[in-house]
From Swiss-Prot:
Belongs to the Mediator complex subunit 14 family. GO terms for cellular component: core mediator complex; mediator complex. Residues 90-100 have a biased composition (Basic and acidic residues). Coiled coil: none annotated. This is Mediator of RNA polymerase II transcription subunit 14. Component of the Mediator complex, a coactivator involved in the regulated transcription of nearly all RNA polymerase II-dependent genes. Mediator functions as a bridge to convey information from gene-specific regulatory proteins to the basal RNA polymerase II transcription machinery. Mediator is recruited to promoters by direct interactions with regulatory proteins and serves as a scaffold for the assembly of a functional preinitiation complex with RNA polymerase II and the general transcription factors. InterPro entries: Med14_N (IPR055122), Mediator_Med14 (IPR013947). GO terms for biological process: regulation of transcription by RNA polymerase II. It is found in: Nucleus. GO terms for molecular function: transcription coregulator activity. Keywords: Activator, Nucleus, Transcription, Transcription regulation. The lineage of its organism: Eukaryota, Fungi, Dikarya, Basidiomycota, Ustilaginomycotina.
Amino acid sequence: MPSSPYGANASTSHQHVKQNAHPSAPLSRTSPSLPPKPTVAMNGNGHYHAAPTSVALDKNKQTATSSHNLMIGVPPAATPNLSLAQSRPPDSKQSSDADGHPVFLSSAKGKQKQVDPIHIPLAQLEQELPLEEADLISLAALVERLANFGYEALQNLAETLPSLPSSSKRAKIFNTALNVRKQFIKLLVLARWSKDISDLQKSRNIIALLSEQQWQHEDVFAGLTDIRKILPNARMRNADLPTAIDVLHTGTYRRLPASIKQMAVAPKPFTDQQALLIVSRLEDALRTRMACRELVPAPLSNYTIHDGKVHFHVPGLFQAQLTASGSAQHELTPSSSDDRWWLLDLTFDVIASGSCAASCNRAFPRKPKRAYRERLRVWGDQQLSPVIQSDGVDESNARPLDIAADKTEQGTDVQIAPEKPTDAPTVNEANPAITATHHDDSLMPTAPVQRDAPLSRLFAFLQERALHYQMDILQHQAYELCRLNWGSNLRIETAERPRNLTVHYWTQAQGAAGATQRVESAAAGGSVQITIVDLPDTPGATETLAALFDGDDDQSSTTHDTASLTTVKRRGLQVTWDADRSILADAQSNNLAISPHSLDIEALLSSVIKQHTLALLRNLQRRILVSDHALSRLLRPEDCTLCLEHIQRQGDEFSTATETTTFNFLQIDLHASQRPRTAKSKPNPKPEQRSASCLAPLRLSVDPVTGRLLLDSEPAQSTTDLSSEQTSQQAASFTASILTTRPNYARLAEASDRINESIDALLDVLYRLDVFARVQEWERMASYLGLRSVRKLALRPQDLAKLGASTLASAEAAPQLFLPLRQSFGGYFLALQPSELAGVSIALVYVVQVMDPTGTPALSVQSIEWLDRAKIAAAASKVGSSGEDVGQEFVATEAGTKRKAPPGVQGETNDVDANFGSSELTIEELADVHSYCIALVSYFRVEQQLRMRGLPYLHVGSNTMRSSPPCKRQRRQQTADARDDGLFGEDASGGTASSDDEAFAGPAGVAGVAALVPSLCLRSIDVLGPSKSHLAKPNISLRVRHWDDDEKLCVEMRIKLRMKSRQFRTLHEVVALAASSDQQSTCALTWIDFDREASLLTLTTRDLDNCMSIFHTHWERVMRMVQLTREVLNASRAWQQRALRLRRSCKKPGERVELCRFELDSVVFSYGSIKVDGLEAKLLVRVRWQDAKLEMQAFSPIGVTQSGGYILEFGSMRSVQVEALDQDAQLREDGVSRWFDETHCLANPHKVMALELRRTVNVAARSAAMHAMLQPQAERIVWRGFLELLQHTLPLVREMAPLVDKCLTHAHVPEVEIKSATWFRFRFQDRYAIDVRLATRSRLVVSDASRALFASEVRTSESESESETTDAVPLDAVFGGSQLLNDLLDATTLARKCSKPKTRIAAQLSSAQFGPIPNIEHVLRSVHAKLDAITWIDARDHRSSAARLRVYELGRALLISLPSASHPNAQAAYHAIAHLVPLLIDRVEAQLARSTP
């Protein structure tokens, strides 16, 4: 098993000893070379043999050959830990386990001294890591290889270029440069990545350490397992008496097996060469001397013994080879001249690097030249010569060694000698077998003997020589720099006692032209001084505790003397930087050091200059940011930052390799084109896209050689962590940067000269460049967006004062750029004005042209509206935020007042980051602001029309205080239809003619600039009027669409209709066309859309200035069809409402009114059925509106005005086609027209009275329109009466329609005369006539045409004048159902006043034209009796008394009461009415036949 507590140390043939290894226990004086206790190990053949304790096994059960010793966390030792170390005695030091517990050192007295592992320096731990360099390539090799590649490419180009034609030369140069550039870009990436190579190497070393520890742990486990397996074989057997008798009797054991003899019996001595034997014995003697007798200083603890020599290695100083004459005498024996050390060879452990490495290696090689090396050997032998006892004491008093009083702390370069145990066994105690002479001498008191320490003297001598050798190398490099690279910018001073080297840099900076007034003395040069000094010693905790606990013992003084002999004074090179106090105060670190393995004074000087430059730039940065100049108030800390750039320095006369270095500069972003816009309210703000700059950011740098300040433009991104967005932006800004390089170079060169003359000029120059850069950036953004830009407008001074008082004082404060909104918006401009606080201020300006008193045209500012960018950003971030319900509040916006943000939006604005106010304008923001201003102007024009018409409106949504239009009552919010934009709510009852109470939901799905622009909400009662407001929901939406596109801009009015049906279909109708932009085609100017699912009517027009008049015109046209459709739907569902009112189920009536088709200009519905060719057919009516027009007559230049009105067309359609119509909602137009052709039209009986019906409807509609203001429900009653008139007259016209044609061919058939829509006359023999009239309350009157029915028809003129003064009747008596005839039946109605003269004249003409029918009372009674019989039979069949037709005989007339069309049993009553006309004709003809002679 390994003896080391920290792992198995590999043993090699050379016995390598590590400096930081854990010290072995003190060896016994009498037996210094006792072999360690062997352990059992197994070889590859499976045999077991004795192995030393230092041998470890790897994972393959073989002897480990790794040279790395896992001694992590062990304190440094003065005595080396030999690989063939002896076993630790019981009183040896105890170390902690691997879990990090403190280490306890036990002394001979049993006391424990604690060493805290946390005090072990990190650098020491890193040095103990194994170096893992596999699969790594040196960066220097890559740099050198690529440099040679570039040089070779240029040579080939120079050789082949003259032979090429002129056109190919440019291509050849471009391709060569491109190929070389690609390789160097790869090298740049590797170089930037190599800054973390130290961390990567450390990680690889730690991984290697962990891997090695893992394998060693596995080896330990395997060894323990093997021991566990073989331990049973080592059990002691019972006493073998026969064997013991044989051994005692004969001296041998004759029964010994041959295998045991081969393993246990010692082999014969080797017969090797004598020289090898001597070397081996010498190595043993050297080991014994170094381990037991010699006082070895701590720096020389790291040594190896091989080839008969001791090889010492002091890192950073030297490597020496020594030998001795023997194993040395006892430490108490006086030194002898024959027993001494000899210096054989010497090599300095230094490496020169940098550009002067080649010349330094030639002048100062690591192994000194022969002559100097021989002198050093002689001087070293003098230091190693033994010192006699008396001479040694005098020499120690005259020239004592620098001995530390206490041990230094762990982690320093000074190595601490182990403490000698005070109770260690003496020589006599350890070796009892010593001769009697020595025993007698030990009993006698002896005087103390001063021990000689030749190795300490040698180390002090060689340390001094090594440091002087390093100083010579640095001095040589400094003179080489002055001779070649730096020239007169360096001054060198040297001194010998003490040895130092001083280098002054930037010696010509203040003496140069224009550099006498630099930034005080901060830019002046400094100096670097290198001196050989004594390194400070720090007493360690272990030595201090030992002095406290062992101070009373006599042995402690002996231990202290022994330790003091091995402790030497360490010396080294110290670097001191001297510069101005402000520079030293701003410097990051003043700790400069020189590594012996990388001696490069140029690198040291560059490091000092970098710190000087960095401190100088910080000083300038503070001056720029905290000054009272306008530029300082404009710039933010992130706009003036210190940046780091990795550059490649080309080779020079010393080396052709390319070196990667860092470069500090001050980056000043004047126009701040890359300022991020972030808000506090956003938890994870997204960075905006950075726009490319027309003028790159400026960099203020310092020339490292001359020390002059340089101002230049930023060619590309300089930071090492470039994102993908920044990379794409570099490509985007390539063109702009190239175009501005040449003019900027001369401007910046002149600015650099002015800065070197006076630092105050820097702020003025930067401010002018800032204004110039902003205007260029704004103009470039406008060009990218396709916007025109104007630098100046011909504004008068008084108009400029309206833009701010500072515009008159400074030209830079006035607006620098004006952007016209749109060609159609003449006079509107976006004014961009530089601002110190906000970066840019944007105003919407409206200007008009005026004439000055001198007659010169000028522009006058009529209105200015400053846009608050912070409020716009806050409102955009809160899209869709809900506001408070304003209920019935309805505020009309006055003309000329500005929109004001509500308090909620103001509160959100306060949460915006304060840095946003200083953000610069971006392309996205400019586009949003431009679009937002176009929307403002567009809405202003629409609002202007509303104010002219006196229509109040509200702003809804966006950043207004209303997220929804007002409702009549507070109700539960319902989910809005997506097609409505949340403007209209659904009816509570689900019907079409429900209450106007509505719930409202705010708009959703709106983002971008559209979220900032509110829509307009109007009341339907104001827009449509009180008589039409019932057709739509209470609110109407009015908004401008596509305002950012001039060709697609349109105004949209959305009206939610109060009707729904499955017969609806989506409609789109273009009502006006206009020429397109290319003047070659036409496009829609005004169109109407109807959504069948949401019943949403959308009126759209592109005429922004006349949108309200267009909407009103087209609504009047569509409104008539909507009103008729609504009444048709109500009539078709009347039976359902009756069933709900009576709370009983009822059967759907067959002769009900049903909607067939709804168009924007026509409505088709059915109202009954008829048998055609044995098949049932539906009776259809198509109602259209025709506008008034002027028609030219033939052969006449004078036109005839055709009055407009409703057109009624009657047709028919089979019932099976009605079912197909329900399935095919997209029925073609030609199929609908076929329903109303001549064939289908003749099948409808109402065709005979179509003219009278049209006249009646138009007269009633005009009368209702005239009285709409007083009676808003009049127009609704017109269509209700029309529908009931169709149903009431249907049974009559079914019988009269055939008579119209038969009377022309049959003489006995009476002639049918249709007097009006409610008055039918049957003429018999041109002398007699029967009138059938439809009266009020669904009553039918049959009378003789020759006699007046009522006395009111012959009332005198006096009674007429009295009746005219009567009051108007209620609304229910006007145009209610069949009340279209109340002008004939009721003398008190309003219609009576108008038609009374005509009625009287018609009655007088009838009395004079026709004669009385003989015995008319008998005829009417017989008809009455027959109708009662028919009604009784039908009632019995239907088993319902409600179906009976009530007929009243009035003597001279019959009064028949008709049931309502919605009654479930109305069909039975209408079937009885069908017998009235044939029965009446038969009875009259029979009576006339009997009375005729």
